[in-house]
């Protein structure tokens, strides 16, 4: 073999060795990148797990340390009917009692909502049921809000389940006056106060007159009043007074009871959004403030299980009856809202389980106005 051939062989070995080294270096680089990525993922997961443990710990502490109005339900009396319900979706009946007395949990349910918590999708959906809705209550045609006053939370839940084919087995009753302190804790809620709402909130006076009325019931001498109409931050007492307005239209044009429930949903959505972004360390104080004004069948373990979805979830809302679904006809119920209950049931289930807004569902399925009262 000549000198030139040996040189070529040496060069080939060098090229091979160099390629091998580069390949090893590339593998090492990829390994290091994977290692760094894995470390980042592990770190993030550790933080999230730690956060969840911290939140759960604070909730356990708060719910054990502070008394709350826990009640037990007889599930045989609730009429739960939905066979195709999903394990990761929890439906809860929410009843709002607007008595002006912050400590009362009795009376007509001024607002009725179905709160659906999807722990998998991390969504919370609210469906408001108008209190003047004509339904069957204990076998008789009546307004839906009569169920709570005549048979308590069990009859009210049964009425929702039987008329809208649902699987509700838990509830929470909230005294809306008790929301005042919670709203103040989160720094208030943003709302747009129209000129009519500001100057002529009721037949008897302005929004500030409503605020003064609420303050008098609470023993407050100098409540903070609203200075002018427009978009602004409302304090707790201002927001609760604003949510009670029925006479005037909202900024979106909704009137009467439609407007009132729209304001209530807005206040609840704002409160939820601000509470969800609140520092975890403030949770015990927030819960302590909330619990005296809530009566619920949920145990503290169930509340803790739902907490992650509430903390990181998004909130969407709809209202029953949906626009243009009312039926003209005699119901025997004065000033009742008469609509097809089967169609309303499908609207609700499409929203909760399929993620379809009412607008989307109606576009795909023509409105059914078939009367059901003979």
Report each predicted region and the residues it spans.
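Entry/capping segment at the start of metal-dependent catalytic domains
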Residues: 2-6, 11-14, 27-122, 244-245, ...
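C-terminal solvent-exposed extensions
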Residues: 82, 102, 133-142, 281, ...
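Extracytoplasmic
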Residues: 87-90, 107-112, 121-129, 139, ...
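Structured segments of extracytoplasmic/periplasmic soluble domains
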Residues: 95, 101, 132, 159-167, ...
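Second-shell loop/turn segments in exported
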Residues: 101-104, 142-150, 165-170, 229-230, ...
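Flexible, polar/acidic helix-loop-strand segments at domain edges
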Residues: 105, 184-279
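Extracytoplasmic/secreted envelope proteins and their assembly/folding machinery
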Residues: 109-111, 141, 153-161, 176-180, ...
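Amphipathic, coiled-coil-like alpha-helical scaffolding segments used for oligomerization/assembly
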Residues: 150-218, 297-299, 318
